[in-house]
C-alpha cells in the first residue's frame, strides 16, 4: 500500500519518556498501595461538555488538577477554547490542557488530537511571558500518534463557511487522517518533501485555493517542528499507562461538547472528532477500564456558536440578558454565542451517550435577576410530543420546546456571588447556602435528568464554585 509523503530513507527518534515522577501526594498514595498489592484501581476522571461546548470545562479541570498527577487532552485541536480565571489573570487556552496552571501536574496532548505546532508555540510563549515556565519536554508531552495541522489545511478550511467552523484547519486535517495521508509527529523524520508538496498543491487546486507550497518551505517547517518540540514527542499512551499502574490520578479533558460529536451531535453542524466518552480513553491511548468518574459539564442555560438549529434559542430581552451577563462570546473565535433556556432533551441525549456519574452545573449566577426560569422538558413536532432528539438536523428545525416554568431569584454582583460560594464551602453549607429558588432549580434538574449535580458554578473565579456536601 502506498504511503504518500513518507520516505523510509531517513531515520530519527523523538522519544522522550519522563523517568522521574514527582513525589506522590497523600491523596493518591493509597491508590499506589492498592496497585502494588495487585488490586484493581480506576484512577481516571473524564470531563466532558454535555451541550454544544463552552460549558466551563477549563475552570473545572483547573480545580480537579489540584489533586491530579496528569491532565490529558484526547481529541480536537485549537478549535477548543478553555478559560481559567486566577484572581485578576484571565488565561485562555486552545491547545494546552487546563492543568497547566498547576506546576506539579503533567500535561499530555494525546493520540486523537490534531495539533497546529505554530499555535502551540505561541500559546507556550504567551504562558512564559505571563510568568510561567515552558513545560515542553519537562511536564508537557505530545503524542507521536497525533496528527499535525499544516498551513495548507488552514487554507482549505478557510474556504468553507457553510458549517460555521473555526477555520483552524481541524476538518481538513482529520480528513487527511481518515484518508490515511496525514502527517503524524512519529513520521517527521521520514518526510518526502517533494511528494508532500505535490499532494498538497493538488489538494489546494482541487479546493479552488490560490495558495501553493514548495518542498523547500515544507522542509523548513518540518525542521522547525523537530527542533522546537522534539524533546516533548513521545508515546504518551505508554506514559499514561505507566502512570496509571503507579496509581496516579489522571484527568481526561474533553473539548467542544457532545452535541458537536461527529457521530452523536447535530450533524452536519458538528466538529470533526468524537467528543464523547467512548473516545476519551481511546484518544489517550489507554483502556476504558481505568475510568471511575465521568463528569458532564452543563450551563444552567444553553449556548451555541455557529450554524444549526437550537430549539430553545431566545431572541428577546432574556436572550440579551444571558448574552450580556454571561459574557457569551467565543474564546476561540470571539463570535457571539446564541443563548437559550436549559434543554433537558439535549441533556438526556448527552447522558445516554456518555453515562455521566455526576453533573457540574455552571453559570447559575447568570440566571439571577430573571423573574422566571424555564426548562425545556420535551419537543413538539406538529401534534406529536417527543422526549428524545431527532437524528436529522432538518427534523430538529421542526421541534418546538415544551417548557416547565420556575420562579427566578435575585441578581448579585460577581463579588457577591464569590462571597456566597466561599461561605457555602467554608461553613459546609453546600447548596443549602444558595437562594431557595436556586436550590429548587437544581433539584428540578436532578429530578428530570436522574443524575446528581455535584457542583454549581457562581462565576468565573476559581473559588466561585459550590460543592455538594
Please describe what each predicted stretch is.
Residues 11-13, 31:
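Cysteine-centered motifs
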Residues 2-7, 32:
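Ser/Thr/Pro/Gly-rich low-complexity, intrinsically disordered segments
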Residues 42-469:
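Non-transmembrane, aqueous-exposed alpha-helical and coiled segments at domain scale
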Residues 28, 32-33, 38:
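Short, positively charged and aromatic/hydrophobic N-terminal segments
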